[in-house]
Amino acid sequence: MSAATDEILEKLKSLTLLEAAELVKQIEETFGVSAAAPVGGMMVAAPVAGAAAAPAEEVEEKTAFDVILEEVPADKKIAVLKVVRSLTGLGLKEAKEVVESTPKPVKEGASKEDAEAAKKELEEAGAKVSIK
């Protein structure tokens, strides 16, 4: 590795969890990307021979789902906050912002199973959740 990348890596190692979350947010905003890990592997472009069949396959079934936190009753905020933190790995401040600024995506690009599991956990904690 080059000296520049070594230096960046060392600085990243010294970040607190809160600073790392802020860094991720800034990178997402600056470069217009999402840090959500793709569940189910990378999407690969269809071969040229199968290009005509590709659009029909995409219509058949959606593979990436977003879990949207729609509403949180005031008396359930703490329970929902704990679930949001466990699902996302966010710090307390970031998770609180998500819970208090509904509707807000909690998980993006999740598999159907993961999205359903997250929805179930959030609903058990008292939140109103949708999957898109």
Swiss-Prot record:
Subunit relationships: Homodimer. Part of the ribosomal stalk of the 50S ribosomal subunit. Forms a multimeric L10(L12)X complex, where L10 forms an elongated spine to which 2 to 4 L12 dimers bind in a sequential fashion. Binds GTP-bound translation factors.
Entry coiled-coil feature ranges: none
The protein's role, per its UniProt record: Forms part of the ribosomal stalk which helps the ribosome interact with GTP-bound translation factors. Is thus essential for accurate translation.
Xref: NCBIfam families: L12
Key word Ribonucleoprotein present: yes
Protein name, UniProt field: Large ribosomal subunit protein bL12
Biased composition (Basic and acidic residues): 100-126
Alphabetic keyword roster: Ribonucleoprotein, Ribosomal protein
Record organism: Thermosynechococcus vestitus (strain NIES-2133 / IAM M-273 / BP-1)
MF annotations from Gene Ontology: mRNA binding; structural constituent of ribosome
